[in-house]
């Protein structure tokens, strides 16, 4: 800007109003103004009044002296040229040609003229140009007054225009006069500010307030430590404010000295302190605009109160005296913007430049703009500049230059003396970036050569001592901040460290919980929570739901508008901000009062051992933790909640590890080699990298062709020099140079730009639906060559758009517009750099086309491979393992965002940008590469390509297995599958081997190296053969009818045949008990038992008992044998030793199946014992405290049985009584008498027994005897032999008693109690009389439930337990287990309460079963999917219930209250049926015979939202799931068919795989037509129509000769297995088929079995053999008694043959009977009468009296007797 006046080197003449000016100067020079509204200094109005102020008041204003005044004078039409012009420059236009609004300008100028009383005719306002307006004057005095007035009003803040005097008549004395006037004006203004300025007043009030607070603390005695610390903090704040005021006054005095020093005027100013440095270097002519800007900037600094302002002179002193200084100041102290201005103001840089480096380009540009704005008018134009990129042709010319540390490094390489730079400021040194550390090391060497160079290292949290010691123990200056005190609260989490649920670490949930707790309990104030990633931030925002608060995300991928939301106010709602470490130092959020520190941060770390850069979550450093805590004390005292312990904090690193130890050193080594540093290991780093990192970096540079080794010294190649000039990461530079060689320069530059910004281009934020939409939008850009090609296509399309459309296009396609612009800036910088440094022309055209596959794709892939040759990974061949990194052998997966996944394929070889370590490790920025290209690399890759390819896992498919076999092959929860995988890996010594089962495709995929494939295949085939054998042998154990007693059992198996019919009540099923801690392999265990017993297993049931349940934990399961002989043999063997564990087999409690299946009833447990050591006759009674005297009185004279006992007090114990003379009495016998005499139940009595134990029978013998006795006493209800189980424990040497555990069926509790009561006091065989059995009158049982069930039924369970407590006879106790579950222990003195209480508990804890006709196996299988699990969780949350899914049996139960169960059942049925229906309306876009790019083609053809299909199929609702490659159709089946047709047409088009083959129609072997509603048989996998199979079953039921039922396929004939019958037939039909099969079995048994002779009786009995006697069969169904030999009524004592004859001729039996007997017939009724003794008078049953001698008949007995006496001489009695 031009000066307002010429240099003040002219004198004043005697004729130029000396007296007036002298008087004006002397009287008004140092007087301050009394009020802002008073007229300007030395100014009087000159218009419309006497002009006494002017020398000749007779002349009017603007009067020229060459003309005489005349009252009639009228000015000519053409105005005369003015002598003086005062121009007004607008501040916005002072340094530019900015166009201003003319009307606004004119209004402002006219208002200002009116204020200064300037005539309207003097005003001129141009429409264009940088001059806002001007005033014309003829008289000097008017012009001078106008200038002074305008500056006065500007100083008062009434306008912003800059006055500038343009004199047409130059008189030196006039200029001096004006200078004096303005100097007086400015001096008065400065004095006014120092005395009464508004800023000064506020600061003084603040000092007074702080002083009062300090005094109030000082008046108190005995201050606590916290209060004392608070006092110290306030004193520090007060001192800071005082220093600010002193600094302001010092600056004002510095300006005053400059103002008065021009002409040597004396002024009463305090002398400068000794050694003080002038804060302003003001020389030469007065620049009033600059002086005013300096004053205003000082006022702003005073009001802003930046802490560094108080340290200005202290900083300047140090910089003037010392060459190096470390400046430590907290974020927000102002060091980044103010220090450069301090140095520029003070002139420390002289005529050279001050350079301030920043780690990031955006920071350098932002700070330069800010400093330029703050210092506007304080310096000349272009004093402050920013150099974001290096150019070898540009020189540093500005006074203050902001640039990146990378840019300064490039300058250093060009000019190793940094000529033209006098001061270097390294900002943000606490970040310890690679460039910063390298720059510090190079500057250290330079400082010894350039003594005039100054270095200032600025940091917020850096280790000042380390930096000071590194720089020759230089000085450290600490700038204390203005933070408020922050209370630290350590609140470590109870969850296991690093535990992960659903991909989210546990600490994220802890942060959300803490935020909820703070919101509920703490006062108002914003909550700021620190997490590590965008995913965690979004997860936390979704989980934090509170009406009175708003959760806001803050991370680097948000747009500016979204980030700005955290700075806005939300009335009535508390802000809860979940942020990444972007909120640590980069941003200052107002109002934050509470901080939640998770203690975790995500860092990129280079691992020299593997040569990989890994982004992983780790602990923060102490300095970062303090930074986070400091966020809570910006505006008021705050609190920081650290979710870790104080010990954890103490164990953290003090500072963040320097980047030089965390990143690849390629760029640094290139620059050092370019600088001639040959021995890098001995280079003087601040923190030297580990030697391995240096070696790996050198190896990488050699691989890239940038470095070669000659004579043991590494030298740069020609390509290496080019990479140095580019200043990029070597891999990016290699990428660009490689593309230029293939004439694809544009593509190479863009690739380098997008690769550097790859993680932020696609914008996947928001809720779940938003993210899914973003995924769909991304598909249209996905390229089958990988992520870099995808990013390249995105940039190409974006760059082709007009600029005004780009932002909207990014928004529509979920792209980050800011990242795209950043890529564009990078592209432009690279183009300029390449043209300037490499003299290459950057092409403006594209060669590569993303829509066409050409040679350019191959070239690009080759260039990318050459640039990332060390980052190669090979697909292992096994999806679960993913890719194997070539250098390290790690198995990692592609990141879910990888473009390759959109094509459903995994290329064999890929290159990747970096490894991302979150919960798992992922490859990111992945590009496919060709196998042949690996051999073309020069130099060759640092791994053996051929060897890696040989180790690749091959795949072998095992087909022909049914879904049932595959499920059983996997086992419950895949345990059997995992076991066989473990065995295969152990056998082959290869942990990569895998086995994958696809039930939908009915195949097993084996993954193994070629050499091991046969071993793995053999293992799998053996297991499959086992499962197939068991499936073919599988039987249903069915009772022929329901009832007790001797109920026949049939084994109903494959072919619908009866495999065995058991009518002799021999058991077939055994319970298997496993005693061992290791998890057992079920298949191995069953195979072991079959071999040991030499029998076939036909049914297996695995118990689902909780391992923590002490009653059930040893039970493995239940197995059924095909023959009772095998079952008996299994139970006869005492123990099986299996892999170091013990197996025991017992006859099973519960057998049967179908409608006659007997339910298993929970067991009740009782304990018994008998002594092993004989009694000594003495015992001890322990009394409750304080009751011994009373008890002694009660038992003073005691007789027990026939024994008189002696009572005495124990002298060695205060609460014991000794009792002797007991003989062989037991503890129970004595205690019963004692309790009766004392009427107490709290006594404790024990007998002193002899030292040695007597010989007892073995535990096995005791078990058998006890079982025999108890079972004999329980036989009233014909119980099964297995209703009682007895276990006698092996005693230890020091045990006084033998102990046994008895378990019995809870239904028989009454019989069991009676049996145990009778057993009490008995003596077992082989025991002595005193070894009496004692049954503990305490029965126990327990039941366990999971924590989830407990939380659901907690209230009902408590109510139930409370009711149990009120009942007599039993107790219940609830206790948690160590694994988080809950156990209910039931204790009672009788068995019935135990059984009843357990039954009610089981009903509550096991829930209500859900039976719905629509819940088929296929429908219920949805619940095992991820969507099904989420569905159950949602219903559980909404209905407050818990849903139990039995995955093995596919049954569903619901726990909760009756009302809630009903609601949950209704919702579950509705939701699951809807989901099943939707699954029927899914179209899959991925499969073995589907073109891999089908999903992209669908998106390309119909749009990401499938709008093209919706327009053609009206009313259909479609949604594309990109993760699963599925189109979900919501609409009718007809709509689905239409959509499917459109997709199929697209799929048939030409693709990389060619046309899709036509589907082969399958013919049903029964109806010989195309299969309709097909079903594959489990045994042979042949496909039939389901209806045909059902018809086959129906025909077999009608024709008994059709058994067994076989597969109808030609050359098959395999029996249809039980699994098929269960799947195809209802229970009713299955029972009907069983009945038909039973009839067929009996009919075809060759007479071995027969049905009961009673019509329609279902019972069957075994026919006695020819040599067997006819044993009776008592039918349990109809109670008939039948001879098993002749099948007639049971006929004891008569042979079957004779009984048959008697049946045929009843008289024959009478005659046979009468032989040899005194027998005659009644003459009347012909009845046979046998006479054995007595007289000859006989009476027949017909009532007639008969004479036995002559058979005469009489009606009465007297005539008969008379006849005997008369005719036969007597009645026939022998006298």
Swiss-Prot record:
<dbReference type="Pfam" id="PF24638">
    <property type="entry name" value="KH_DEAH11_1st"/>
</dbReference>
<feature type="zinc finger region" description="RING-type 2; atypical">
    <location>
        <begin position="1722"/>
        <end position="1750"/>
    </location>
</feature>
<feature type="compositionally biased region" description="Polar residues">
    <location>
        <begin position="35"/>
        <end position="60"/>
    </location>
</feature>
<feature type="region of interest" description="Disordered">
    <location>
        <begin position="1"/>
        <end position="77"/>
    </location>
</feature>
<keyword id="KW-0808">Transferase</keyword>
<dbReference type="InterPro" id="IPR002464">
    <property type="entry name" value="DNA/RNA_helicase_DEAH_CS"/>
</dbReference>
<feature type="binding site">
    <location>
        <position position="1696"/>
    </location>
    <ligand>
        <name>Zn(2+) 4</name>
    </ligand>
</feature>
<feature type="zinc finger region" description="RING-type 1">
    <location>
        <begin position="1564"/>
        <end position="1612"/>
    </location>
</feature>
<dbReference type="Pfam" id="PF24641">
    <property type="entry name" value="KH_DEAH11_2nd"/>
</dbReference>
<dbReference type="InterPro" id="IPR001841">
    <property type="entry name" value="Znf_RING"/>
</dbReference>
<dbReference type="InterPro" id="IPR017907">
    <property type="entry name" value="Znf_RING_CS"/>
</dbReference>
<feature type="binding site">
    <location>
        <position position="1742"/>
    </location>
    <ligand>
        <name>Zn(2+) 5</name>
    </ligand>
</feature>
<dbReference type="Pfam" id="PF22191">
    <property type="entry name" value="IBR_1"/>
</dbReference>
<dbReference type="InterPro" id="IPR056245">
    <property type="entry name" value="KH_DEAH11/12"/>
</dbReference>
<dbReference type="InterPro" id="IPR056246">
    <property type="entry name" value="KH_DEAH11/12_1st"/>
</dbReference>
<feature type="domain" description="Helicase C-terminal">
    <location>
        <begin position="510"/>
        <end position="676"/>
    </location>
</feature>
<feature type="binding site">
    <location>
        <position position="1691"/>
    </location>
    <ligand>
        <name>Zn(2+) 4</name>
    </ligand>
</feature>
<feature type="binding site">
    <location>
        <position position="1588"/>
    </location>
    <ligand>
        <name>Zn(2+) 1</name>
    </ligand>
</feature>
<dbReference type="InterPro" id="IPR018957">
    <property type="entry name" value="Znf_C3HC4_RING-type"/>
</dbReference>
<feature type="zinc finger region" description="IBR-type">
    <location>
        <begin position="1631"/>
        <end position="1696"/>
    </location>
</feature>
<dbReference type="GO" id="GO:0016887">
    <property type="term" value="F:ATP hydrolysis activity"/>
</dbReference>
<feature type="binding site">
    <location>
        <position position="1567"/>
    </location>
    <ligand>
        <name>Zn(2+) 1</name>
    </ligand>
</feature>
<keyword id="KW-0347">Helicase</keyword>
<feature type="binding site">
    <location>
        <position position="1580"/>
    </location>
    <ligand>
        <name>Zn(2+) 2</name>
    </ligand>
</feature>
<dbReference type="InterPro" id="IPR001650">
    <property type="entry name" value="Helicase_C-like"/>
</dbReference>
<dbReference type="Pfam" id="PF00270">
    <property type="entry name" value="DEAD"/>
</dbReference>
<feature type="binding site">
    <location>
        <position position="1582"/>
    </location>
    <ligand>
        <name>Zn(2+) 2</name>
    </ligand>
</feature>
<dbReference type="InterPro" id="IPR027417">
    <property type="entry name" value="P-loop_NTPase"/>
</dbReference>
<dbReference type="GO" id="GO:0003724">
    <property type="term" value="F:RNA helicase activity"/>
</dbReference>
<feature type="binding site">
    <location>
        <position position="1686"/>
    </location>
    <ligand>
        <name>Zn(2+) 4</name>
    </ligand>
</feature>
<keyword id="KW-0934">Plastid</keyword>
<dbReference type="InterPro" id="IPR042035">
    <property type="entry name" value="DEAH_win-hel_dom"/>
</dbReference>
<dbReference type="InterPro" id="IPR002867">
    <property type="entry name" value="IBR_dom"/>
</dbReference>
<feature type="binding site">
    <location>
        <position position="1657"/>
    </location>
    <ligand>
        <name>Zn(2+) 3</name>
    </ligand>
</feature>
<feature type="domain" description="Helicase ATP-binding">
    <location>
        <begin position="316"/>
        <end position="480"/>
    </location>
</feature>
<dbReference type="GO" id="GO:0009507">
    <property type="term" value="C:chloroplast"/>
</dbReference>
<dbReference type="InterPro" id="IPR056248">
    <property type="entry name" value="RBD_DEAH11/12"/>
</dbReference>
<dbReference type="InterPro" id="IPR011709">
    <property type="entry name" value="DEAD-box_helicase_OB_fold"/>
</dbReference>
<dbReference type="GO" id="GO:0016740">
    <property type="term" value="F:transferase activity"/>
</dbReference>
<dbReference type="InterPro" id="IPR011545">
    <property type="entry name" value="DEAD/DEAH_box_helicase_dom"/>
</dbReference>
<feature type="binding site">
    <location>
        <position position="1607"/>
    </location>
    <ligand>
        <name>Zn(2+) 2</name>
    </ligand>
</feature>
<dbReference type="Pfam" id="PF07717">
    <property type="entry name" value="OB_NTP_bind"/>
</dbReference>
């Amino acid at each position: 800007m031009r000066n307002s006046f010429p240099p003040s080197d002219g004198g004043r003449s005697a004729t130029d109003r000396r007296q007036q000016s002298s008087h004006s100067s002397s009287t008004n020079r140092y007087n301050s103004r009394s009020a802002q509204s008073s007229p300007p200094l030395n100014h009087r109005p000159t218009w419309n009044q006497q002009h006494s102020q002017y020398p000749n008041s007779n002349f009017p204003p603007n009067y020229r002296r060459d003309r005489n005044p005349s009252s009639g004078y009228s000015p000519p039409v053409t105005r005369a040229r003015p002598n003086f012009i005062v121009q007004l420059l607008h501040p916005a236009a002072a340094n530019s040609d900015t166009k201003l609004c003319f009307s606004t300008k004119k209004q402002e100028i006219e208002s200002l003229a009116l204020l200064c009383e300037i005539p309207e005719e003097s005003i001129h306002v141009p429409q264009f140009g940088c001059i806002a307006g001007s005033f014309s004057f003829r008289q000097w005095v008017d012009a001078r007054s106008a200038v002074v007035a305008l500056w006065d009003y500007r100083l008062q803040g009434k306008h912003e225009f800059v006055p500038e005097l343009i004199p047409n008549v130059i008189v030196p004395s006039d200029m001096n006069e004006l200078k004096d006037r303005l100097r007086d004006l400015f001096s008065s203004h400065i004095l006014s500010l120092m005395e009464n300025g508004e800023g000064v007043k506020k600061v003084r009030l603040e000092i007074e307030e702080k002083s009062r607070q300090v005094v109030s603390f000082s008046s108190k005695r005995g201050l606590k430590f916290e209060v004392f610390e608070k006092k110290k903090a306030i004193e520090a704040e007060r001192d800071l404010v005082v220093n600010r005021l002193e600094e302001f006054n010092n600056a004002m005095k510095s300006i005053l000295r400059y103002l008065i020093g021009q002409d040597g005027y004396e002024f009463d100013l305090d002398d400068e302190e000794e050694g003080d440095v002038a804060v302003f270097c003001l020389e030469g002519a007065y620049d009033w605009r600059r002086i005013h800007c300096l004053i205003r900037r000082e006022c702003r600094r005073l009001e802003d109160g930046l802490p560094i302002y108080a340290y200005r002179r202290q900083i300047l002193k140090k910089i003037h005296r010392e060459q190096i200084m470390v400046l430590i100041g907290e974020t927000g102290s102002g060091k980044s913007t103010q220090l450069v201005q301090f140095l520029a103001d003070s002139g420390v840089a002289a005529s050279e430049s001050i350079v301030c480096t920043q780690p990031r380009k955006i920071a350098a540009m932002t700070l330069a703009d800010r400093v330029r704005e703050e210092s506007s008018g304080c310096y000349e134009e272009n004093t402050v500049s920013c150099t974001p990129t290096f150019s070898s042709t540009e020189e540093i010319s500005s006074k203050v230059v902001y640039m990146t540390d990378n840019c300064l490094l490039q300058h250093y390489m060009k000019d190793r003396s940094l000529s033209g730079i006098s001061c270097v400021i390294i900002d943000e040194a606490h970040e310890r970036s690679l460039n910063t550390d390298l720059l510090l090391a190079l500057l250290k060497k330079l400082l010894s050569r350039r003594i005039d160079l100054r270095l200032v290292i600025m940091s917020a949290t850096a280790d000042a001592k380390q930096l000071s010691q590194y720089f020759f123990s230089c000085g450290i200056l600490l700038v204390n901040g203005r933070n408020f005190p922050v209370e630290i609260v350590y609140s470590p989490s109870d969850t296991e460290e690093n535990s992960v649920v659903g991909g989210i670490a546990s600490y994220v949930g802890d942060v959300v919980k803490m935020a909820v707790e703070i919101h509920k309990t703490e006062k108002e104030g914003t909550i700021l929570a620190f997490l590590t990633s965008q995913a965690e931030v979004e997860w936390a925002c979704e989980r934090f739901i509170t009406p009175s608060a708003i959760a806001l995300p803050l991370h680097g991928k948000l747009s500016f508008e979204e980030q700005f939301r955290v700075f806005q106010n939300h009335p009535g709602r508390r802000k809860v901000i979940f942020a990444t470490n972007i909120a640590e130092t980069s941003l200052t959020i107002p109002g934050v009062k509470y901080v939640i520190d998770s203690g975790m941060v995500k860092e990129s770390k280079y691992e020299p051992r593997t040569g990989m850069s890994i982004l992983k979550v780790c602990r923060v450093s102490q300095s970062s933790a303090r930074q986070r805590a400091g966020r809570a004390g910006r505006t008021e005292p705050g609190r920081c909640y650290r979710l870790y312990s104080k010990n954890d904090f103490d164990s953290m690193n003090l500072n963040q590890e320097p980047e030089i130890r965390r990143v690849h050193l390629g760029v640094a080594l290139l620059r050092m080699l370019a600088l001639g540093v040959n021995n890098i290991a001995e280079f003087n780093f601040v923190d030297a990298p580990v030697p391995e990192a240096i070696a790996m970096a050198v190896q990488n540079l050699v691989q890239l062709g940038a470095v070669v080794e000659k004579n043991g010294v590494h030298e740069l190649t020609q390509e290496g020099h080019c990479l140095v000039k580019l200043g990029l990461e070597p891999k990016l530079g290699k990428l660009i140079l490689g593309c230029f060689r293939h004439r694809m320069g544009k593509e190479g530059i863009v690739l380098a730009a997008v690769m550097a910004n790859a993680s932020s281009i696609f914008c996947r934020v928001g809720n779940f639906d938003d993210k899914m939409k973003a995924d769909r939008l991304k598909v249209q850009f996905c390229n089958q060559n990988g992520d870099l090609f995808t990013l390249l296509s995105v940039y190409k399309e974006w760059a082709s758009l007009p600029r005004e459309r780009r932002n909207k296009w990014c928004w529509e396609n979920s792209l980050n517009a800011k990242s795209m612009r950043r890529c564009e800036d990078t592209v432009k910088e690279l183009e300029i750099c390449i043209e300037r440094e490499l003299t290459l022309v950057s092409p403006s055209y594209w060669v590569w086309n993303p829509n066409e596959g050409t040679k350019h794709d191959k070239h690009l892939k080759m260039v990318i491979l050459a640039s990332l040759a060390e980052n190669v990974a090979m697909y292992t061949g096994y999806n679960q393992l993913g890719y194997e990194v070539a250098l390290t052998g790690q198995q990692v997966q592609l990141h879910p965002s990888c473009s390759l996944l959109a094509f459903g394929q995994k290329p064999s070889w890929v290159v990747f940008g970096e490894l991302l370590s979150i919960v798992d490790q992922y490859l990111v920025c992945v590009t496919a590469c060709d196998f042949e290209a690996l051999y073309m690399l020069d130099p060759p890759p640092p791994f053996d390509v051929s060897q890696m390819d040989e180790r690749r896992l091959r795949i072998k498919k095992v087909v022909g297995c049914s879904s049932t076999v595959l499920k059983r092959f996997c086992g419950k929860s895949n345990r059997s599958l995992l076991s066989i995988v473990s065995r295969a890996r152990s056998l082959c010594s290869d942990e990569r081997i895998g086995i994958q089962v696809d039930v939908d495709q009915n195949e097993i995929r084996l993954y193994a190296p070629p050499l091991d494939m046969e071993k793995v295949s053999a293992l799998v085939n053996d297991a499959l053969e086992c499962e197939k054998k068991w499936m073919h042998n599988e039987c249903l154990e069915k009772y022929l009818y329901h009832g007790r007693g001797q109920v026949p059992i049939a084994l109903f198996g494959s072919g619908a045949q009866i495999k065995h019919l058991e009518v002799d009540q021999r058991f077939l099923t055994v319970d298997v008990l496993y005693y061992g801690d290791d998890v057992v392999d079920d298949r191995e265990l069953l195979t072991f038992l079959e071999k040991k017993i030499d029998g076939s297993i036909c049914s297996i049931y695995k118990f689902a008992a909780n391992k923590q349940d002490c009653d059930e934990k040893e039970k493995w399961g239940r197995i059924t044998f095909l023959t009772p002989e095998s079952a008996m043999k299994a139970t006869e063997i005492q123990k099986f030793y299996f892999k170091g564990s013990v197996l025991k087999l017992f006859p099973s409690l519960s057998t049967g199946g179908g409608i006659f299946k007997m339910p298993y009833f929970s067991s009740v447990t009782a304990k018994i014992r008998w002594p092993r050591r004989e009694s000594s006759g003495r015992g001890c009674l322990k009394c409750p405290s304080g009751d011994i005297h009373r008890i002694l009185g009660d038992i003073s004279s005691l007789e027990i049985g026939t024994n008189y006992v002696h009572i005495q007090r124990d002298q060695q114990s205060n609460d014991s009584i000794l009792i002797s003379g007991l003989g062989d009495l037991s503890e129970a016998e004595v205690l019963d008498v004692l309790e009766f005499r004392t009427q107490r139940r709290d006594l404790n009595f024990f007998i002193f027994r002899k030292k040695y134990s007597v010989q007892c029978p073995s535990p096995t013998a005791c078990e058998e005897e006890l079982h025999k006795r108890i079972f004999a006493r329980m036989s009233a209800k014909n119980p099964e032999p297995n209703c009682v189980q007895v276990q006698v424990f092996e005693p230890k040497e020091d045990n006084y008693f033998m102990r046994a555990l008895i378990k019995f069926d809870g239904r028989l509790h009454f019989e069991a109690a009676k049996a145990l009561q009778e057993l009490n006091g008995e003596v077992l065989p082989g025991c002595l009389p005193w070894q009496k059995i004692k049954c503990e009158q305490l029965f126990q049982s327990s039941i366990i439930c999971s924590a989830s069930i407990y939380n659901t039924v907690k209230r009902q369970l408590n109510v139930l337990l409370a009711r149990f407590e009120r009942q007599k006879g039993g107790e219940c106790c609830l206790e948690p287990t160590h694994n988080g579950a809950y156990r209910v222990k039931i204790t009672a003195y009788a068995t019935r309460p135990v059984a009843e209480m357990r039954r009610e508990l089981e009903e509550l804890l096991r829930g209500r079963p859900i039976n719905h006709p629509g819940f088929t196996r296929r429908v219920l299988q949805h619940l095992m999917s991820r969507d099904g699990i989420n569905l159950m969780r949602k219903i559980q949350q909404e209905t407050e219930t818990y849903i139990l899914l039995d995955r093995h049996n596919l049954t569903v139960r619901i726990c909760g209250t009756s009302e809630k169960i009903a609601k949950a059942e209704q919702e579950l049925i509705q939701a699951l049926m809807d989901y099943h229906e939707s699954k029927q309306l899914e179209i899959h876009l991925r499969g073995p015979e589907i073109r891999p790019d089908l999903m992209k083609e669908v998106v390309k053809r119909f749009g990401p939202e499938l709008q093209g299909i919706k327009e053609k199929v009206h009313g259909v609702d479609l949604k594309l799931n990109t993760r699963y490659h599925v189109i979900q159709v919501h609409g009718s089946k007809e709509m689905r068919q239409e959509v499917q047709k459109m997709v199929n047409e697209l799929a048939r088009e030409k693709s990389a795989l060619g046309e899709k083959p036509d589907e082969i129609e399958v013919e049903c072997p029964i109806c010989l037509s195309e299969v309709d509603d097909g079903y594959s048989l489990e045994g042979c996998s042949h496909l039939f129509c389901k209806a045909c199979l059902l018809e086959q079953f129906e025909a077999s039921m009608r024709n008994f000769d059709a058994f067994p039922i076989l597969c109808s396929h030609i050359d098959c004939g395999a029996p249809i297995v039980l699994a098929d019958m269960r799947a195809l037939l209802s229970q009713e039909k299955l029972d009907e088929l069983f009945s038909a099969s039973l009839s067929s079995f009996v009919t075809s048994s060759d007479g071995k079995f027969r049905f009961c002779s009673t019509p329609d009786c279902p019972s069957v009995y075994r026919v006695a053999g020819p040599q067997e006697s006819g044993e009776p069969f008592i039918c349990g169904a109809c109670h008939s008694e039948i001879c098993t030999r002749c099948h007639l009524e049971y006929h004891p004592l008569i042979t079957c043959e004779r009984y048959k004859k008697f049946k045929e001729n009843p008289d024959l039996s009478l005659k046979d009977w009468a032989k040899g007997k005194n027998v005659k017939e009644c003459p009347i009724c012909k009845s046979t009468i046998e006479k054995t003794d007595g007289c000859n008078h006989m009476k027949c049953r017909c009532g007639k009296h008969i004479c036995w001698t002559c058979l005469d008949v009489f009606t009465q007995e007297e005539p008969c007797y008379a006849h005997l006496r008369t005719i036969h001489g007597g009645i026939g009695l022998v006298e």
